[in-house]
């Protein structure tokens, strides 16, 4: 199974390669585009980073908004904290 790093790297390398070929006019894509779209090709990496950041922010906000309250996990965690405190008191590390 391919790791996520390899998958993302392949997409990024492909995007950069296509953009670089279009930007340096090795592949004459800009001659077929209207003049108003040339700036989109020139600033495509900036737009890609910008949209990736926007996606990341909305993904985090969505994750926080739909986060479930885990009552069982809270009780379990409080029990583990109590056990740790009792053990530290037995070892006389805390009072």
Curated annotation (Swiss-Prot):
A single cellular component GO annotation: endoplasmic reticulum membrane
Subcellular localization, as worded in the UniProt entry: Endoplasmic reticulum membrane
Topology within the bilayer: Multi-pass membrane protein
Source domain of life: Eukaryota
Key words of the record: Endoplasmic reticulum, Membrane, Transmembrane, Transmembrane helix
UniProt keyword annotation of RNA-binding present: no
Coiled coil: none
Transmembrane intervals: 10-30, 44-64
Primary site of residence: endoplasmic reticulum
Any Pfam family: DPM3
Function: Stabilizer subunit of the dolichol-phosphate-mannose synthase complex.
PANTHER family per the UniProt record, alphabetical: DOLICHOL-PHOSPHATE MANNOSYLTRANSFERASE SUBUNIT 3
Name under which the protein is recorded: Probable dolichol-phosphate mannosyltransferase subunit 3
Source organism: Caenorhabditis elegans
Lineage: Eukaryota, Metazoa, Ecdysozoa, Nematoda, Chromadorea
Gene name for this UniProt entry: dpm-3
